[in-house]
């Protein structure tokens, strides 16, 4: 087992990475201080892993309740969140009750938001079961739900007590879900570590095949990068914004198509190819770097051609973004491979990227 610590002073917590973690009661024990835990999971994950986690926590002498929600991004709503609150109130959960988020990013985000809100804050543990949630969404304390006009627009910062990333759970992921997680792995290399990006390039075939050792390496590499960024900028007032590389385009794709039509990682993957293209158009990176980002995204079985939402619609959707200020869209771009920054962009270059992205992969798009 590998442990990476998120250094946030009194809110610091460990991220445990390994196999067989779901059954290890000793990993849960330090973080469930009350007498009760509530596992929040979904209809897909519950039959696979809920009994294992429940047994581990019960072995500590704790009372365990379970909330099983429908699966999918389209259920990341107020209505679904209220089902968690209803269950907590019905079970008599108090301020010492620990919530356990067992599932992917949707479950982690909603459980974390419920924990941040219930009785003004209760502890929770992240047990991510998808690659995307293990390398990204379970780390850093961002929680929330979607609004019809924008993704993750309603939420709170609420750090978990611990993260247990069990690599065994990745073996049951459908190929599309695995690919979606690879988008965030690639993102971390692109924005912060060129050597890590090159490692992903060398091992992409094995990663696509879900090789356990390579997956552990990818989770560790990504978590180390994200933990370092979060430790420096917990509330996204500066540096942490670079973790949104590809997300301004990606969130617009998700909202424009309807949440759940594309997986979050698929939209981010396409968004990274678009952001790399825009970085090149503005003269920050050379064509080879742009092509490497797009080629690796494609090699990870992610889309690199954007849906044709229309340029005006795309821009309107991107204005509903947490980075936007006074209606001005901000993008995370690459200054070079492994170094990202936040900036505004000229309208003509943005429109050029949008127009070419829906016609052909950015690697094939002529640059004006």
Swiss-Prot record:
Reactions it catalyzes: 7-phospho-2-dehydro-3-deoxy-D-arabino-heptonate = 3-dehydroquinate + phosphate
SUPFAM superfamilies referenced in this protein's UniProt entry, alphabetically: Dehydroquinate synthase-like
Pathway entry: Metabolic intermediate biosynthesis; chorismate biosynthesis; chorismate from D-erythrose 4-phosphate and phosphoenolpyruvate: step 2/7
EC number, UniProt record: 4.2.3.4
Compartment(s): Cytoplasm
Gene Ontology, cellular component aspect: cytoplasm
Residues given in the record as Zn(2+) binding sites: 184, 247, 264
Keyword Phosphoprotein attached: no
Example of a GO MF term: 3-dehydroquinate synthase activity
Binding site for NAD(+): 71-76, 105-109, 129-130, 142, 151, 169-172
Entry annotated with the keyword Nucleotide-binding: yes
Domain of life: Bacteria
GO biological process: amino acid biosynthetic process; aromatic amino acid family biosynthetic process; chorismate biosynthetic process
Function (record text): Catalyzes the conversion of 3-deoxy-D-arabino-heptulosonate 7-phosphate (DAHP) to dehydroquinate (DHQ).
Family of the protein in this entry: Belongs to the sugar phosphate cyclases superfamily. Dehydroquinate synthase family.
Name by which UniProt lists this protein: 3-dehydroquinate synthase
Organism: Ralstonia nicotianae (strain ATCC BAA-1114 / GMI1000)
Encoding gene per record: aroB
């Amino acid at each position: 087992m590998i442990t990476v610590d998120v250094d946030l002073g009194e809110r610091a917590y460990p991220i445990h990475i390994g196999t067989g973690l779901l059954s290890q009661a000793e990993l849960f024990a330090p973080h469930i201080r009350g007498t009760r835990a509530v596992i929040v999971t979904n209809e897909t994950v519950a039959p696979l892993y809920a009994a294992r986690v429940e047994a581990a926590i019960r072995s500590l002498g704790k009372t365990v309740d379970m909330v099983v929600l429908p699966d999918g991004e389209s259920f990341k709503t107020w209505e679904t969140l209220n089902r968690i609150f209803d269950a907590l109130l019905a079970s008599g959960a108090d301020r010492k009750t620990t919530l356990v988020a067992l599932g992917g990013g949707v479950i982690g985000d909603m459980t974390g938001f419920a924990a941040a809100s219930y009785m003004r804050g209760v502890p929770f543990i992240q047990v991510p079961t998808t690659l995307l949630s293990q390398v990204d969404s379970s780390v850093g304390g961002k929680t929330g739900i979607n609004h019809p006009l924008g993704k993750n627009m309603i939420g709170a910062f609420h750090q978990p007590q611990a993260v247990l990333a069990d690599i065994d759970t990745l073996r049951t992921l459908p190929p599309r879900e695995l690919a979606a997680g690879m988008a965030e792995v690639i993102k971390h290399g692109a924005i912060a570590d060129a050597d890590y990006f090159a490692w992903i390039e060398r091992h992409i075939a094995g990663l696509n095949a879900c090789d356990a050792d390579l997956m552990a390496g990818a989770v560790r590499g990504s978590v180390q990068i994200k933990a370092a960024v979060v430790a420096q900028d917990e509330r996204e007032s500066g540096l942490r914004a670079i973790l949104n590389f590809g997300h301004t385009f990606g969130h617009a794709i998700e909202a424009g198509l309807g949440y759940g039509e594309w997986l979050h990682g698929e939209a981010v993957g396409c968004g990274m190819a678009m952001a790399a293209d825009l970085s090149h158009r503005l003269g920050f990176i050379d064509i080879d770097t742009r092509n490497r980002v797009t080629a690796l995204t494609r090699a990870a079985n992610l889309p690199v051609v954007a849906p044709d939402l229309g340029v005006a619609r795309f821009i309107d959707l991107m204005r509903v973004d947490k980075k936007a200020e006074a209606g001005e869209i901000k993008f995370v771009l690459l200054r070079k491979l492994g170094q990202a920054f936040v900036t505004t962009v000229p309208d003509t270059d943005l429109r050029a990227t949008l127009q070419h992205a829906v016609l052909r992969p950015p690697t094939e798009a002529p640059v004006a």
